[in-house]
């Protein structure tokens, strides 16, 4: 099976184009096998895409985490999938529209420098109600801002949003040590109030235009960056009145730009080609 590897700020993915390989059917098992970093190729996730209309730039997108679970959406994953299609000239024009489990997402090609593509994604409107996220503490809530979530007898004021997938934002004055925040991220991910589990972001606000984020990704664990996580962190910062509506998000591998205008949140960032390869299916 042929694949291409891309990454966006260290968040790495293996792209499988269904128009070039025979569909395996068991993508969950394949993701677990191929994403394993010691016995497989190694990646945070597997992207399965197919072009439906090259002239209109229409394609389908599915993402499977390294643990085999299927996610609704991934900002960095969408960007990597778009970079693949642009690099292979699989679509005409400078825009690709992906049909995802969370609805249509539009990606615009901005520029290319060698193997690095800059792409802007329209992620639509954030979902803020407890039913839409989903978040279930037994009450219906229009917004979840500074909710007192108890983890191991410690209360964390969290802000919860969905960018097509659930995110729990934890604001800190300084980042906890790595062992502590990884343990907390794992506990929050599987908290019973999140019926579909959740992604977790630990956020430091530098000023009204910049935040810094650490990421715990559902089904993966620690990641160097996260597109939807960066967007959710920016949205949470805006909801709390801590930043303006145009936010630079610092990750451990570089920045992403998030802009919230009206009902639309857009994110601009890089996606970089790494290599192509083939994987022997068992």
Where are each of the predicted segments found?
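Membrane-interfacial helix-loop segments of redox and metal-homeostasis proteins
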Residues: 161-163, 177
């Amino acid at each position: 099976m042929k694949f291409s590897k891309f990454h966006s700020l260290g968040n790495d993915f293996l792209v499988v184009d269904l128009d070039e390989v025979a569909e395996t059917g068991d993508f969950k098992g394949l993701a677990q096998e191929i994403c394993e970093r010691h016995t497989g190729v190694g990646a945070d996730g597997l992207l399965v895409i197919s072009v439906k209309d090259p002239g209109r730039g229409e394609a389908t997108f599915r993402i499977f985490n390294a643990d085999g679970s299927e996610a609704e959406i991934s900002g960095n994953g969408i960007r990597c999938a778009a970079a693949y299609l642009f690099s292979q000239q699989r679509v005409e024009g400078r825009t690709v529209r992906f049909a995802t489990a969370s609805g249509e997402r539009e990606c615009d090609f901005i520029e290319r420098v060698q193997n690095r593509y800059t792409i802007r994604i329209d992620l639509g409107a954030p979902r803020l109600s407890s039913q839409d996220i989903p978040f279930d503490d037994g009450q219906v809530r229009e917004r979840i801002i500074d909710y007192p979530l108890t983890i191991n007898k410690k209360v964390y004021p969290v802000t919860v949003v969905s960018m097509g997938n659930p995110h729990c934002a934890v604001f800190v004055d300084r980042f906890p040590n790595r062992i502590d925040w990884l343990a907390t991220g794992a506990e929050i991910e599987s908290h019973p109030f999140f019926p579909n589990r959740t992604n977790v972001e630990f956020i430091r606000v530098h000023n009204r235009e910049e935040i810094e984020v650490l990421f715990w990704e559902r089904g993966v664990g620690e990641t160097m960056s996260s597109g939807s996580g960066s967007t959710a962190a920016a949205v949470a910062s805006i909801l709390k009145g801590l930043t303006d509506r145009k936010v630079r998000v610092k990750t451990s591998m570089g920045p992403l730009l998030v802009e919230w205008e009206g009902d639309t949140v857009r994110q601009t960032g890089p996606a970089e080609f790494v290599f192509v390869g083939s994987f022997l299916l068992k």
